[in-house]
Amino acid sequence: MGLKADNWIKKMALEHNMIEPFCEANIGKGIVSYGLSSYGYDIRVGREFKIFTNVNSTVVDPKNFVEENVVDFVGDVCIVPANSFALARTVEYFKMPNDVLAICLGKSTYARCGIIVNVTPFEPGFEGHITIEISNTTPLPAKIYANEGIAQVLFLQGDEPCDVTYADKKGKYQAQTGITLPRILK
C-alpha cells in the first residue's frame, strides 16, 4: 500500500472527479491553508455547523441520537464553546476509487490551539461530503473559520482492489451531502 503524491492526486481529481471542487495550489496566506500539498490534500470546512448543547439535558446516545442535542449554525466563523464539540462538513465532495483508502488528520494550526479534528477513513468506493468532528478541548471558546483548511487527507492505494467497496455494501453514509448525524442501520 503506497502513499500517493501530488501529481497522482491532481490527476485523479481532474480526470476522475475524485475531489470537487479541487484547488491545485496550496492556498495559505492570511488563512488556514487548503488545497494540494506534496503528499495530501488540505480540505476546507463548509459554512454549516451543528454545535452540541446541553440545554435539553439529554444523554448523547449514538444508537438513538436526539437532534435536540445540537444547534444549527451557518456562518463564516463558528464559535465552538469551551470543552464542547461541533460537527461540520467539507466544502469538497469526494468520489473514492475502489483501490484507495484515505486517512484524514487535523491541521497543526488548529491542534496547537486545542482544537482536535476527527474524521473516519474514506473507504474505497465511498462518495459524498465528509462529516467532520471538531472538539474544543480548551476552557475557552474557539473559532473555526469556514471555507478555510481544517484537516489534511492522505491517500493510500492498495496493492489490489478490495472485493467489497463501501458502495457495494451500501454504506449508511454513502452519497451524503451536508452534515450527517449518527446513523444505526436497523
Curated annotation (Swiss-Prot):
Keywords: Hydrolase, Nucleotide metabolism, Nucleotide-binding. The lineage of its organism: Bacteria, Pseudomonadati, Campylobacterota, Epsilonproteobacteria, Campylobacterales. Catalyzes the deamination of dCTP to dUTP. The active site is at residue 133. Belongs to the dCTP deaminase family. This is dCTP deaminase. The gene is dcd. DCTP binds at residues 107-112, 152, 166, 176. One of its GO terms (molecular function) is dCTP deaminase activity.
